[in-house]
Amino acid sequence: MNKKITLNIQIASKKIIFLPKKCQYLIWIRSSLMHVYQSNIKVLIRIVEKSEIKSLNYKFRQKNKATNILSFSYINDKMIDKNYIGDLIICSEIVTEEAKKKNVTLESHWAHITIHGILHLLGYNHDNLNNRIKMEYLETKIMASLNYKNPYIY
């Protein structure tokens, strides 16, 4: 059965060099969900500048620095629509910088960051070695299924 994905995208950045099309996000999200039996999901992706993601990172994680992505999962929140799995906040500037540094395509790196974020929304984490190995394995498997290179070898 095809899962219905409701995706809302907010653009809150003027510093965008590359932005995936909505259909690309949907492919990446659908591929990330292949092991999940939830029929329908809702996700928000917000594209922001460094200042906003730095502020959010400090407010919610007490880290006073910008990051590539923040994930806010609502999957276990009984007060929110059961299909709404969460929000992904992505800093396009940092994703672009990282892609250049790693010498990978912008599309590939956006795919990886989106998949990484979706897995966080679904409860995967890299807070210890065992969890990191599981999460990186899944990310690599999903990326390969979409004909992208291993995101951890560059």
From Swiss-Prot:
Keywords: Cytoplasm, Endonuclease, Hydrolase, Metal-binding, Nuclease, Ribosome biogenesis, rRNA processing, Zinc. PROSITE patterns: UPF0054 (PS01306). It is found in: Cytoplasm. Its EC number is 3.1.-.-. Zn(2+) binds at residues 116, 120, 126. GO terms for molecular function: metalloendopeptidase activity; RNA endonuclease activity; zinc ion binding. Binds 1 zinc ion. It comes from the Bacteria. InterPro entries: MetalPrtase_cat_dom_sf_prd, YbeY, YbeY_CS. Its main location: cytoplasm. Its cofactor is Zn(2+). One of its GO terms (biological process) is rRNA processing. Pfam families: YbeY (PF02130). It is an enzyme of class 3 (hydrolase). GO terms for cellular component: cytoplasm. Belongs to the endoribonuclease YbeY family. Single strand-specific metallo-endoribonuclease involved in late-stage 70S ribosome quality control and in maturation of the 3' terminus of the 16S rRNA. HAMAP family: Endoribonucl_YbeY. This is Endoribonuclease YbeY. It comes from Buchnera aphidicola subsp. Baizongia pistaciae (strain Bp). The gene is ybeY.
